[in-house]
């Protein structure tokens, strides 16, 4: 086995392991570059369902809780969203409504009641899920919502306040909607859930293997709702991960630790992840994500402090300095320009990190930065290649 890989070789036919590692890094960089402050928190937004009941209600002109009568008819039990032209009073009979092809429509008269939505365009009905009539008040809370793309931070905060009590609601479609909408909200809006979710409930949900996909959000909410006991619990978990180079829920736990532990824990985590050269690439990715989320949700002073810390990472973890380039450019922190110029000239930069660094230097507009970009591009065109150890690349422990 060759003990070295030339950067140029990676553009040819890399092994599956290397290809997977590079794809992971590229995905991480795209997440950072495409997640402006007012948008979804990147720690857990990827786990949210693409289309929640709230979003479906925006596209519906009628929504009713109804029970099947057999023969294709339904009886309205509760109106959730009504059309002025229709009679959706309790007891109204829906005679053989037309459903979207492929819908799982209950036909037996003894089947549970369901929430039916009629689409504004086309007029066909869809089955949103089982729902008892007793859930009507909660379902009505979802009516009148805005599309995510039209929402301000204040809108998101109001949505979190409304939906936090519906987390893990016994009606599955309501629980999924509450989770999905809060998971895709900005972190600054998630803070509106403080004192609206009990830490004891969050501990129960976090301990349930069946809810594992929802843990990233629930760790964030645990930190937001933490008292002294919860803060110590979070810190102990983060410290255990630090000792073992663990990655399980790391970004969400780090963010929770920053929220619950304040400035003292920030100092600890800063030293552990950004000043320790032995940290792996996956650990650094998770730490950058957590600190970025907090910086974007904080004030200018916090962003400045985070930017300075990230600037130091360019010197401490030279090959991976590109991890923070997009954030530094977004925050217009140009003090790292000399370090990035030196990094390009040394050719120690990992090739996957190269483009974000070039983009950062170009965005700075500084003559020395633009000259370095031009020189780097000229060098690349000559086919010159730097060398990195294979073992370092595969382990993630790149100096």
Enumerate the predicted regions with their spans.
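Structural detector for internal amphipathic alpha-helices that build alpha-solenoid repeat scaffolds
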Residues: 142-153, 176-192, 213-227, 248-261, ...
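Solenoid-like repeat scaffolds
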Residues: 167-168, 204-210, 237-246, 271-281, ...
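Long, internal scaffold/assembly segments composed of regular secondary structure
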Residues: 207-208, 218-244, 255
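Amphipathic alpha-helical scaffolding segments comprising HEAT/armadillo-like alpha-solenoid repeats
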Residues: 156-164, 188-204, 227-240, 262-274, ...
